């Protein structure tokens, strides 16, 4: 969900980090660090082109995922991302147009999750909080 001045701007199903592979998304309170159009997101074994990228915790951010046909429910448990928040392309465009740098991001899991992957440990809420003072 994205609320501005108490009103719902947009909502959508998402796909967060794949917890079965230890790539859970960081949970905590963050802010949009910057916005970038036409980015290539690069990891150890992938490179994904996205139209709209809005990072909030180091290299973890909200972006379109044109390669996905479904979003929401429990996809993240077995077919999630490398940690980013995947949203449908039309919703990513709407968010990109309406979010401002500095907009708060509240990320959480509904059930307890143990994050174990090295890249998740590096990008977790504690390290981000320590560096940014959030």
Protein language model annotation of sequence segments:
Residues 22-29, 34-134:
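Exported/periplasmic cell-wall-interacting domains
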Residues 1-27:
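Cell wall/extracellular polymer interaction/catalysis modules
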């Amino acid at each position: 969900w994205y609320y501005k001045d108490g009103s719902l701007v947009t909502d959508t199903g998402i796909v967060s980090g794949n917890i079965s592979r230890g790539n859970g998304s960081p949970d905590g309170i963050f802010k949009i660090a910057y916005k970038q159009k036409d980015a290539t997101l690069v990891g150890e074994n992938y490179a994904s082109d996205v139209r709209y990228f809005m990072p909030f915790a180091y290299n973890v951010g909200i972006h379109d995922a044109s390669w996905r046909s479904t979003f929401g429910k429990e996809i993240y448990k077995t077919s999630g991302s490398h940690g980013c928040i995947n949203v449908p392309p039309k919703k990513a465009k709407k968010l990109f147009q309406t979010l401002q740098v500095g907009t708060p991001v509240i990320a959480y899991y509904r059930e307890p999750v143990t994050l174990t992957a090295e890249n998740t440990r590096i990008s977790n809420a504690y390290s981000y909080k320590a560096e940014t003072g959030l």
